[in-house]
UniProtKB/Swiss-Prot annotation:
The lineage of its organism: Eukaryota, Metazoa, Chordata, Craniata, Vertebrata. Residues 32-37, 93-103, 148-151, 211-222, 280-286 are extracellular. InterPro entries: Na+/solute_symporter_sf, Put_Na-Bile_cotransptr. GO terms for cellular component: endoplasmic reticulum membrane; Golgi membrane; plasma membrane. This is Sodium/bile acid cotransporter 7. One of its GO terms (biological process) is sodium ion transport. The chain crosses the membrane at residues 11-31, 38-58, 72-92, 104-124, 127-147, 152-172, 190-210, 223-243, 259-279, 287-307. It comes from Gallus gallus. Pfam families: SBF_like.
């Protein structure tokens, strides 16, 4: 396979490398308040575009079916809001005897308590071809559930989720009713559109990361915390994969994809305001914020890199299940 053909096939991975390099060279372009105004273009326009895109591409029956998939919702919410923070707390009891900065460890604990984001898990699920409708419900519900029970103003959370998730999704569904035949005939590249939006999110996320003011943190602690975060993400993704692919789990391969991403992703948009309120007045707030600031780009980067692998598994698994369900033709003697 030639280089150009390889790049065309793996354009998304190449795109990730390019946007990260661009963010490193000139982070001021994509930071909050910069020329791109990500606080508007990403928080509102890009997220709204994602869910309008989902409303256009998803059949109403798929959304209804996902809403009624109570077992999947319980799995994701219990893993995210109960298992995740509990497991992190137990892990930190071991790390507390190490020389790692105690405020970084407190930051890791807060990461475990954060709600899921409303965009990255949905885009990655769509990129793989998983149960996008279930990902939409769980991402929005998890953010609303934990966000509304925290110190962050309830009205602010509700209005933002309503305007950027619910309204675009409904509008997409309404538009779909009128252009349904055209959509089925032309088959627009919804997955590619969502992937391009994700590249925008990755770019602005890394702009914020690279432009972040210098924090009084030794390189050893920083390297260790990055290693721990990637290890935690990989371990939890593997755990959700194991739990959701058991023979008696009742989940399809597409469900598993949604579960993997929705159960392990954490929100920076809700997370930072929550930290600023809960730890207001703490001189070590910047250190407490470091794990979340690392976790957010790490989850997007890791998830994006794993898209081809997870997609390959899902397709092969779906084919295998289809073959096992086909009726056996009796052999004539």
């Amino acid at each position: 396979m030639g280089l150009l053909e390889r790049l065309r096939k793996e354009w998304f991975i190449a795109g990730i490398a390019l946007v990260i390099a661009a963010a490193r060279l000139e982070p001021a372009v994509g930071v909050k308040g910069g020329p791109l105004k990500p606080e508007i273009t990403i928080t509102y326009i890009a997220v709204s575009a994602i869910f309008f895109n989902s409303g256009l591409s998803l059949k109403t029956e798929e959304l209804t079916s996902a809403l009624m998939h109570v077992k999947l919702h319980l799995f994701v919410q219990i893993f995210t809001l109960v298992f995740f923070p509990t497991a992190i707390w137990l892990f930190l009891q071991l790390l507390s005897i190490t020389p790692i900065n105690e405020w970084l460890l407190k930051g890791l604990q807060t990461v475990g308590c954060m709600p899921p984001p409303v965009s990255s898990a949905v885009i990655l699920t769509k990129a793989v071809g998983g149960n996008e409708a279930a990902a939409i419900f769980n991402s929005a519900f998890g953010s609303f559930l934990l966000g509304s029970s925290s110190s962050v103003p309830f009205t602010s959370i509700f209005s933002q989720l309503f305007m950027t998730v619910v309204v675009p999704l409904i509008i997409g569904q309404i538009v779909r009713r009128y252009i349904k035949d055209w959509l089925e005939r032309r088959k627009p590249p919804f997955g590619t559109i969502s992937s391009c939006v994700l590249l925008m999110i990755i770019y602005t996320t890394f702009c914020d990361t690279f432009a972040n003011p210098n924090i009084d943190l030794d390189k050893f602690s920083l390297i260790i915390i990055v290693f721990i975060i990637f290890s935690v993400q990989m371990s939890f993704m593997f755990l959700t994969f194991l739990f959701s692919t058991r023979s008696n789990s009742g989940f399809t391969p597409a469900d598993t994809v949604a579960i993997i991403f929705c159960s392990t992703h954490k929100s920076l948009t809700l997370g930072i305001p929550m930290l600023k309120i809960v730890f207001a007045g703490y001189e070590h707030l910047s250190l407490i914020s470091v794990p979340l600031l690392i976790y957010h780009p790490a989850q997007i980067l890791l998830g994006s890199l794993l898209v081809p692998t997870i997609k390959s598994w899902m397709v092969s698994r779906q084919k295998a299940l289809k073959l096992t369900r086909q009726p056996k033709v009796p052999v004539k003697v």
